[in-house]
């Protein structure tokens, strides 16, 4: 398969590991919940009857997967992150760990990052951060700086560790979004199954798995964000001024 075609369908490494994987898990959990209902319908349909049917079936799966990827990415970025880090995402780790009050990074390390940002982006961070008593305003200043840092880092050849941490954070966030979608759809399936007299075994097991997955991802989500933020700044510090 042509590499460009492959990327156009499945995306780059980040898309495949941080978005496609959660979307696939979400679809599988929903399909499992639909087990008894689908079995009743598929008994009357020979999906794999011909190459045409197989092609249509494959295209349908691809379309559903692409739609689910878009839904999960959109929901996770616009809802999960805002619920976790605030409406303006001012509590995001890339902001929080640079605050003077944060002990996650040493003061010396934070100063190195801020001094470099001051030179690179010609911003007077001394006045904006050190002499500012309103923490919300400080967070907004740091948010602007980290946004510039992220853009600068995106233009250089990032380390493998950075890519792994970025993917891990994105995958955690998108798994939370995906499992939340799965739970909502599974609840509808459970109610429908109860009304129609189908077995509730598959929907209940599926909901249980989705809830456990959701809780686990919430548990590691914030730590994944902190690890990503640390790696972002580490990559930034090795950037040359002209990059």
Where are these regions (language model features)?
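Transmembrane alpha-helical segments and their cytosolic interface motifs
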Residues: 11-27, 149-202
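Generic, low-specificity signal for short hydrophobic/alpha-helical stretches with a mild N-terminal bias
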Residues: 50, 54, 127, 131, ...
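Juxtamembrane membrane-interface segments of multi-pass membrane proteins
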Residues: 133, 137-174, 224-243
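Hydrophobic transmembrane helix bundles of membrane-integrated enzymes that assemble
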Residues: 28-31, 35, 58, 182-193, ...
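Alpha-helical oligomerization segments
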Residues: 193-243
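N-terminal first transmembrane alpha-helix
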Residues: 1-107, 198-201, 205, 221
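Charge-rich cytosolic interhelical loops and cytosolic tails of multi-pass membrane proteins
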Residues: 78-158
